[in-house]
């Protein structure tokens, strides 16, 4: 055998070995893929889809939800009965082809199975998602229905528990509840017939009506309590109190109180009847109006009761107060009569006393009897209170006026005594001023001083004449005394001024001698001032003339002389 043949045989053997090894490797890889596909198929088949289907089925779906569920359930049945069986068959075929080294067809089967598994996985995911959505929707719907039914059941329980608190509205409430029950029945019928949209609308309306009726029933008991308990109790209390007050001789400014009681009761009945319409705003407004009318009656009675207490108190005060004022008036009249014999009094005192008499007589004639028998009067105590209050205020005004008159007349004699004392002092002062001026040895007395002196003397004489009358006019005495006081003070001040100007002028005229010989201005002022001093007796003008001239040549000289004079000035000795 030639070497070429040997090499060919070896090559063929090697190729066979290599081909076998390659086949073994491919077969092993395909076995791995087939095993993986089998495991994947088992994992998909092992998903809890059946449990989820049974869970959704237990929800007893209806309508569109039930149709959707049936479609997805059928799809799962198709997958389990057909698709998984077909996949199993293709896996078995792939194993057989792989075992027989038919790798190309085996690979085709493996790819086919993988594609089918991908589709199955997508379908299962879609089925599970759809089941989850159906379950979630049904749970939401069930929760809504449960919530609405719970609201209604609570409303039923509340109404049943508080049935006695709804009064005339109970029939209307029961009617509204039957309407809500009908809406729930309509919801069930529509939902069962596969019309979820309209069923949801009906459920919404039923829930809204339940909530609204619940709110109404929460508010009604308070309104009914007012109409059936509070108002009747208050009216009974008012009527009982009214009868008791009448027995105690109370009278009222209004004569239709019984009619007002009846009108309020009719309003209560009318509002109770209207309440069946469940118009709560109107019912509350009417209740407020009724309460205001009841309150006005309470205020009326309380006002009269309070007035009675005030009248009872003032009825004791007024007689004593009147007697006190009359006593004061008598004393004042006696005092004025006594003083009138000696003095001419102001007409005001007499007029005031007459006015006081008139006020006191009016109270005595018209009010005193009322105060002493106030509980026998046929007038409301509030009116009696006004009468007594006015009278007591009048008495207070009279008393204040009496005090003013007393203050005016009590000092009359003192005014006369003081006026006489002052007159005596002023006459003495007038003489002392005259002597003071005479001792000054002036060239003459200024005319303005003489005028003031004689005016003051006349005023003192007028006061003296008034005090010498048989009946003294005390007002004139007071006025003249004030005038005399001011006149004496003015005369005293003028006296000091005249003497000061005269004395200082003499001193300055003498002092000016040191400048006259060489100051023409001083010489001229000297001559003019001397004339004013000796001829005209105008001492102030003379002082002004010479002091001005000296100030021009020796500033401050006048102030020096004035200061020196004030330190040594002689005072009038009164």
Swiss-Prot record:
<feature type="transmembrane region" description="Helical">
    <location>
        <begin position="8"/>
        <end position="26"/>
    </location>
</feature>
<dbReference type="GO" id="GO:0005940">
    <property type="term" value="C:septin ring"/>
</dbReference>
<feature type="topological domain" description="Extracellular">
    <location>
        <begin position="1"/>
        <end position="7"/>
    </location>
</feature>
<feature type="coiled-coil region">
    <location>
        <begin position="459"/>
        <end position="493"/>
    </location>
</feature>
<keyword id="KW-1003">Cell membrane</keyword>
<comment type="similarity">
    <text>Belongs to the EzrA family.</text>
</comment>
<keyword id="KW-1133">Transmembrane helix</keyword>
<keyword id="KW-0132">Cell division</keyword>
<keyword id="KW-0472">Membrane</keyword>
<keyword id="KW-0812">Transmembrane</keyword>
<feature type="coiled-coil region">
    <location>
        <begin position="161"/>
        <end position="190"/>
    </location>
</feature>
<keyword id="KW-0717">Septation</keyword>
<keyword id="KW-0131">Cell cycle</keyword>
<comment type="function">
    <text>Negative regulator of FtsZ ring formation; modulates the frequency and position of FtsZ ring formation. Inhibits FtsZ ring formation at polar sites. Interacts either with FtsZ or with one of its binding partners to promote depolymerization.</text>
</comment>
<dbReference type="InterPro" id="IPR010379">
    <property type="entry name" value="EzrA"/>
</dbReference>
<feature type="coiled-coil region">
    <location>
        <begin position="102"/>
        <end position="131"/>
    </location>
</feature>
<feature type="topological domain" description="Cytoplasmic">
    <location>
        <begin position="27"/>
        <end position="574"/>
    </location>
</feature>
<keyword id="KW-0175">Coiled coil</keyword>
<dbReference type="Pfam" id="PF06160">
    <property type="entry name" value="EzrA"/>
</dbReference>
<protein>
    <recommendedName>
        <fullName>Septation ring formation regulator EzrA</fullName>
    </recommendedName>
</protein>
<dbReference type="GO" id="GO:0000921">
    <property type="term" value="P:septin ring assembly"/>
</dbReference>
<dbReference type="GO" id="GO:0005886">
    <property type="term" value="C:plasma membrane"/>
</dbReference>
<feature type="coiled-coil region">
    <location>
        <begin position="276"/>
        <end position="379"/>
    </location>
</feature>
<dbReference type="GO" id="GO:0000917">
    <property type="term" value="P:division septum assembly"/>
</dbReference>
